[in-house]
A protein has these predicted regions:
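Flexible "cap/lid" loop of the alpha/beta hydrolase fold
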Residues: 465, 473-502
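NAD(P)H-binding glycine-rich loop region in Rossmannoid oxidoreductase-like domains
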Residues: 47-105
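Mid/C-terminal beta-alpha module of Rossmann-like enzyme folds, strongest
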Residues: 241-305, 347-356
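Conserved Rossmann-fold NAD(P)-dependent oxidoreductase catalytic core, especially the SDR/UDP-sugar
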Residues: 81-84, 93, 104-158
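N-terminal Rossmann NAD(P)H-binding glycine-rich loop of SDR-like oxidoreductase domains
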Residues: 5-25
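Amphipathic terminal alpha-helices
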Residues: 316-366, 611
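Active-site loop/oxyanion-hole signature of alpha/beta-hydrolase fold enzymes
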Residues: 417-451
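Active-site Tyr-X1-5-Lys
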Residues: 154-182
């Protein structure tokens, strides 16, 4: 029998993932949304729009009857299950906003629940609330009116206090009316394990924002504290498992792993620093002193509200019930440790480019902790490696041309430390880059056509030299920068300073003077602005300088320029910085600058495909 579910918070960070997973069940979902048209567009862009399962009902959590039209209200009252995962994720909201969203919201949702239970019986109420809520199965049977100001819960922060009181209220109502309630307490939620894509940047993102600015010189709490994390796909799987219980009973489920399985704050910040390519803090400072410093003006400097430290904990939590439901190994197999660097790089990317949207023609995956964008298609994939002063998304137009002309899949890589990929600390820069090639090769057992532009071409040359490629693989090099016309030694600090402080006009002048582009009209729209924004990220700035240092090194120039090879090379003859690498193989000329794959993707694809068997 099809189960009807009222889902509140279905357009949020947790909710969208939940919809995706519930959609595989025999269900009909009433999705409470503020705007039906915006919600439909959101789910279409996410690829989660299941029109036969989803019914969008316009309303408002903060209004009586959830602000629903009478017809929608009657439909909603046919629900068998209510899942409440709604409310803002903003620790700085006012007391009035917090009361409206959480306490009033809890009241109006509970009224709907009571109406359903009296009429037909509510099978299950599922509420998602943060793991720091002080209420559980043992202490929530207390006769307190949560709407009276006298009960302050000894928590000064409006966000936390009202959220936790809402938790208590919904437990009270469930017991009073007689329906089972499952309260699910997740820790800080990050993106799914397949990608690490974390659109909710106000959680872990507060630490990322501070560290990327060099404003996290200490370790709050030291090794005794931790910031528990859970992936939203793991959380959604757990909610679905609870949803499918045959005879649900009222329980609290705390989704916090055992201490020995979790990262302490020192370890978390070390991984964060490494992923962002910055120096890690080592000196610990007590939480109370840290709060005092933040309350004394430190919050304005670091961007970290003092109350956000409440998400750090030195407590142990009972997760026995979770293990009973999911199995004893669940916390280990779903640990965010497995892909945390990708989460951090994703948050950093979102802070760097707050309005950047991913082209829906590409699906994003993680392969060996680097981000790879993939199209659909049949046959051997084209695998593209970008150069410096660019990332994988800059090669999307070329990738689309290759896909449309051949029908074959296209994979575009964000190199470590650039785009959405975390920096990877290795003994040498090339170790991480070659490891990326190795991971990709393991995914394409029948071979692939590798295409490297600029620095990406150097990666493929190095992999070829070390015999990574197989007979079924082929390679095209676009503008391999192996022979500089003029070599100038500039210290790394000067390079870093020059990039970080360069104006839009100076960057454009540099692009034309070096022949990245032949004329200003060939520079893609928003390219210069994107490059300038990129250097607000320490990860991208430091990685760019390090990779540039490596590509300019004497040893690598000798490796790339001396031996006679037989690569297919396409060369833009308006490049003013590099000479044609005639030793590397047959060269086809195009009348464009160094960045011709960005400025002329159609022409580039045409020349690449001249020698490709389709």
């Amino acid at each position: 029998m099809m189960k009807r579910i009222l889902l509140i918070g279905g357009t949020g960070f947790i909710g969208k993932q939940l919809v995706q997973q519930i959609a595989t069940e025999q269900v009909e979902i009433f999705l409470l949304v503020r705007s039906k048209s915006k919600a439909i567009k959101l789910f279409e862009e996410s690829g989660y729009l299941h029109r036969n399962l989803l019914q969008f009902v316009e309303g408002d959590l903060t209004k009586e009857g959830l602000g629903l039209q009478e017809e929608d209200l009657q439909q909603v009252k046919k629900s068998d299950v209510i899942i409440h995962a709604g409310g803002p994720m903003d620790i700085s909201i006012s007391e009035k906003q917090a009361t409206s969203a959480f306490l009033n919201g809890a009241k109006y949702v509970s009224e709907i629940a009571e109406s359903i239970h009296v009429t037909k019986g509510l099978e299950h109420f599922i509420h998602v609330v943060g793991y720091m809520s002080p209420f559980n199965d043992d202490n929530s049977d207390i006769d307190i009116n949560v709407f009276q100001n006298a009960y302050e819960l000894e928590i000064k922060n409006h966000y936390e206090r009202t959220k936790f009181l809402a938790d208590l209220y919904m437990r009270q109502q469930a017991k009073k009316v007689g329906y089972p309630i499952s309260v699910i307490n997740p820790p800080t939620v990050v993106g799914p394990s397949q990608t690490g894509s974390t659109e909710q940047v106000d959680g872990l993102g507060l630490l990322v924002k501070s560290m990327r600015k060099g404003l996290m010189p200490v370790v709050p709490g030291g090794g005794n504290y931790r910031l528990p994390l859970i992936a939203n796909d793991a959380l959604a799987k757990f909610i679905v498992r609870i949803l499918n219980q045959k005879q649900p009973k009222s329980h609290t489920y705390t989704l916090v792993p055992d201490r020995q399985m979790d990262l302490n704050v020192s370890e978390l910040l070390r991984i964060m620093a490494e992923s962002l390519n910055v120096k890690a803090p080592t000196k610990a400072i007590p939480i109370q002193i840290m709060k005092l410093l933040l309350n004394s003006g430190g919050s304005k400097i670091t961007g970290i509200p003092a109350d956000s430290l409440n998400f750090l904990t030195n407590k142990d939590f009972s997760n026995t019930k979770v293990k009973e439901v999911m199995g004893p190994d669940w916390f280990r197999t779903t640990s965010v440790k497995n892909f945390l660097p990708a989460v951090i790089a994703d948050i950093d990317y979102r802070i760097t480019y707050p309005h950047q949207q991913l082209d829906s023609r590409f699906n994003r995956v993680l392969i060996g902790n680097v981000v790879v964008y993939q199209t659909s298609g049949e046959g051997k994939p084209f695998i593209l490696f970008h150069g410096l002063l660019s990332d994988g998304e800059d090669l999307f137009p070329l990738g689309i041309q290759l896909h449309e002309k051949t029908g074959r899949p296209v994979w575009i890589v964000d190199l470590p430390g650039l785009g959405r990929s975390p920096f990877q600390k290795e003994k040498s820069m090339m170790t991480a880059l070659l490891q990326t090639v190795k991971y990709l090769l393991s995914q394409v057992v029948e071979g692939a056509h590798f295409i490297g532009h600029s620095f990406g071409a150097l990666v493929l040359i190095a992999a070829h030299k070390d015999n990574y490629f197989r007979p079924e693989d082929s390679i095209t090099l676009l503008q391999p920068p192996v022979m500089k016309k003029v070599t100038t030694e500039v210290p790394m600090l000067i390079k870093k300073w020059a990039l970080k402080t360069a104006s839009i006009s100076r960057l454009e002048k540099y692009c034309l003077e070096t022949g990245l582009f032949a004329i200003a009209e060939q520079i893609p729209v928003h390219y210069i602005a994107k490059v300038k924004h990129s250097f607000t990220s320490s990860r991208i700035l430091n990685s760019t300088v390090l990779l540039d240092e490596w590509s300019s090194s004497k040893e690598e120039k000798e490796m790339n320029g001396s031996a006679k090879s037989n690569f297919e090379i396409i060369w833009g003859d308006q490049d003013k910085a590099y000479q044609i690498p005639i030793n590397l193989g047959e060269v086809k000329m195009l009348p464009y600058g160094h960045h011709f794959p960005l400025s002329h993707p159609n022409e580039t694809a045409h020349v690449i495909l001249e020698n490709v068997k389709i």
